[in-house]
Regions:
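Acidic, His/Gly-rich catalytic cores of divalent-metal-dependent hydrolytic chemistry
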Residues: 196-215
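Domain-level recognition of soluble alpha/beta enzyme cores
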Residues: 167-192
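Short glycine/proline- and acidic residue-enriched helix-loop micro-motifs
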Residues: 91-127
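Phosphate-coordination/substrate-recognition cap region in phosphate-metabolizing enzymes
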Residues: 34-105
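Loop-to-helix element that buttresses phosphate recognition and phosphoryl-transfer chemistry
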Residues: 3-6, 10-61, 124-132
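Glycine-rich phosphate-binding loop signature in dinucleotide/nucleotide-binding domains
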Residues: 40-43, 139-145
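Short, well-ordered beta-to-alpha junction loops that form the rim of enzyme active sites
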Residues: 51-52, 73, 149-154, 198
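Generic beta-sheet signal
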Residues: 4, 145-151
Length: 215
């Protein structure tokens, strides 16, 4: 029996031209989780990250002495590309500056994508789901007792929804709940794969509660 730990990256730079970059708070969040792992003596046999900068920057705050693999299957869906498919070149700019508008549009746009209403998207919903599935297979090494993956909210919510046999629309409900640097754990064997815990953030208990964010 082995453990797959999925970590959502730390807070990125909302409203900035380069979203794929941790904010100052994000670096603090990642350092907190790294310290927690060290205190708990978590020493995975294998670490995997997506190829986006926010995944690498989050991992840099961990002192993990093991092999690190990169796998693009753990990358987030391309929200800007989905917006282009939804709105064309005239994307409303408040989506990038107003959080309420951003998340409302995120839910609507991704739901349309799931239901094949965005034919011009570079990646189809089916292709996204398939690459996440392949990333899970790549990560679940039966020779490892513990595998840590640094990824994003979309892939994590897709894995959780699939594991629970939830309708695809539930992915967005899960996606919008996932906290920065949260930990979701899965147990796997040659014949089974199940959810053990979801969206855990003990590093933000007590005096660190003010550091908790969802985006």
């Amino acid at each position: 029996m082995s453990e797959l730990i999925l970590i959502r990256h730390a807070q990125t730079s909302f409203g900035h031209e380069n979203y794929d970059n941790l904010s100052e708070l994000g670096h603090d969040q990642a350092a907190l989780l790294g310290s927690l792992f060290e205190r708990l003596d978590i020493a995975p046999d294998r670490v995997i990250i997506g190829t986006q900068q926010r995944h690498q920057q989050t991992l840099e705050n961990f002192n993990l002495n093991c092999q690190v693999d990169k796998h693009p299957g753990w990358n987030e869906y391309d929200f800007r590309d989905l917006l282009l498919a939804e709105f064309g070149p005239n994307i409303p700019q408040e989506i990038f500056t107003d959080r309420k508008t951003h998340f409302r549009t995120l839910r609507t746009t991704v739901t349309n994508w799931m239901n094949a209403k965005l034919p011009n998207a570079s990646e189809s919903w089916e292709d996204f789901s398939s690459r996440i599935s392949n990333a899970v297979k790549f990560s679940c090494d039966l020779d490892c007792k513990q595998v840590v993956v640094v990824t994003s909210g979309g892939p994590i919510s897709r894995v959780v929804a699939t594991t629970l046999n939830a309708p695809k629309e539930e992915m967005m409900t899960l996606n919008l709940q996932i906290k920065n640097t949260s930990v979701s754990k899965f147990i796997y064997t040659p014949r089974s794969f199940y959810l053990h815990s979801f969206n855990s953030t003990p590093q933000f208990d007590g005096d660190n509660a003010h550091l908790l964010t969802y985006s």
